[in-house]
Amino acid sequence: MDIFDGLSALGGLCLFLFGMSIMAEALQRRAGGRLGGQLRRMTRSRWAGFFTGLAVTAAVQSSSAAMVMVVGFVNSGLLTLGQAVGVIMGTNVGTTVTPWLLSLGGLEGGGFPGRLLRPAGFVPLLSLWGIIAYLSRNGRRRDTGQALLGFATLMQGMELMSGSVAGLAQAEGFRRLFTAFTDPLLGLLAGALLTAVIQSSSASVGILQALAASGQVTVGAAVPIIMGQNIGTCITAMLSSVGASRNARRAALVHLLFNLTGAGVWLAVFWVVKVLAAPTMLARPVTLPGVAVIHTAFNLLCTMLLFPAAGLLERAVLRLLPGEDGEKGTELDSRLLAAPSAALEKCRELAGEMAALARDNLRRGVAALTEVQPASAKELRRQEERIDRMEDVLGTFLVRLSGQTLTRRDNARAAELLALIGDFERLGDHAMNLLESGEELRDKDISLPAEDRRELRVLTDAVEEIADLALDAFRREDPAAQAEVEALEQVIDGLKEQLRSRRIRRMQQGSGTMELGFVWSDVLTDLERAADHCSNIAGCVAGLPDGNQGLHAAQTALRQQDPAFEDRVRRYAEKYRV
């Protein structure tokens, strides 16, 4: 082997790693979001979690990416630790798909089918197909094209590496190196170190398959190296869990314990068999498909051994990392960006909490208009601060999420949530304004006349009903509620004008001061604007256009086109008559 063979091997390695990287990236975009949502929904039992983890890892071709996703889900509360254990075991089996694809380079046989299945036959076809798909304007087709180009690139890199190391078969140093790796402990450490450095067990196994093409890697050397690769792949999840919640760190630790225990047990069995039986099979050169067989068999044996003991693994990490999380884990973890559907589900869950806080604050603000309770006022302010923080966190995350490659449906959901959280925050602001108006009435010792109190109660009851209608529509994702909300919102607009005119008339008759008139005007404005935001919420749920002008134009059109709209208005006008 000369310097040019060395450069070819290095170039092949670079192509291999680059191809695997862009293929995994495209597959994560193509399937990660949808499968991420399934990962959230299909983990109710340990077996379901196992098969879901297997499917997700096989689809994105990266156990490291799947584990980062799991850590993010546990950190965000989308998965419990118990659910994560089954998923983690599934990711180990799912990662065995890649070596089987790479073993196509070791196929032999003549004829058209045999030649087509070898890299020299299918790589040009995949490259052509990939380029055509990549030039498409459709995002999903572009991702498919990138995945095909990535696979073609990694197979070309694999061929280049295999051809370059073929000359190593006669190199004495290379033979001595792999003779040393027949020591199980050295092989285990070598596999773990290589995988930890490149942070991909699939890539590490691929490199081993390329070296196996030299004919100098024996079965006895390959087995402990593959065991070590399973340990080295844990580094990605461990690094990902740094700074995460205690439960997320436990999930990463389960992954490490699972692979350490499996490797330890089967390495001991391998060593005993090697010493006592010394089978000649261990001295035979391993083929590319042989590496895939060993990798698959080892991961299946580990799962068979430890799946029944999954509860013990969970209890072990609870003892190693005792205690409870001081606070709820990071509400929106950046790891969720790899699974847009699950990320949107979490965003919607938090938006629901935000809506509930805004509704509770509106109730407290209305109550403060007649009597300010210090404890209630303190809680309203605390919840208002939380609503503001949630809007900042959700808004920032949704903007980042919108920058990812999303399906049309997910993109629409992200835009809807961005609009909704703004309305929830403004609803909370108006509740805060009502509290301040109540405090102003108290501090200035202004009392509302009985007639004003009666009329105000009618308006606040209408506003509380429209808030319930709008927020229930959001929770149930019910677009039909928009018609009821629009009718009630029109009645509230009329009530506001009636109450404003009546207060002016009473002031002209000497009932109430100018200060009362100013506060009264502020209260009516806040209640009317709160109703407007409820109308916006129902409009968003109904899928009306974004933006104030588009939304209001669509609402006006609906009022004109709905033959039952006037009947609804009359019904609410009768209910809330002053």
Enumerate the language-model features and the residues they cover:
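Hydrophobic core segments of alpha-helical transmembrane domains in multi-pass membrane transport
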Residues: 9-22, 53-57, 124-136, 150-161, ...
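Membrane-interface alpha-helices at helix entry/exit sites of multi-pass transporters
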Residues: 78-90, 216-225, 247-257
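Structural signature of hydrophobic alpha-helical transmembrane segments
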Residues: 89, 113-125, 180-181, 221-232
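Hydrophobic alpha-helical transmembrane segments of multi-pass integral membrane proteins
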Residues: 43-69, 184-207
